């Protein structure tokens, strides 16, 4: 059975690109258009991995991450920070506990390697 990955991304084109890449790598992908939807989907049926854009309106990726980690049903799910603000956010994301960081634009090989590493680690 393939791992389930929840993508939280407000830009349709970015979300579609992630979905296509991950689906082509045989992952089951669920999509959230905003932070609230991400929390709802994660709590209803916890995925194996969550990829969250840090710069979403209303409820940004930072707050989504805090809420996921505060909830016992989602606290152990690895989360990948995804953002275009690489210089500013990389250190902060890893410091607060994100499992990994992917900058935009991302390299497909790096993205897939990061996902594979975290999904494999989660399955152990």
Segments and roles (model prediction):
Residues 106-116:
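C-terminal output helix
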Residues 16-24:
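Charged docking surfaces used in two-component/phosphorelay signaling
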Residues 26-33, 41:
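Short hydrophobic/Thr-rich beta-strand motif most characteristic of the beta2 strand and flanking loop
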Residues 45-51:
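Active-site beta3 strand of CheY-like receiver
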Residues 9:
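Conserved acidic carboxylate
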Residues 56:
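Receiver (REC) domain active-site loop signature in two-component systems and cognate sites
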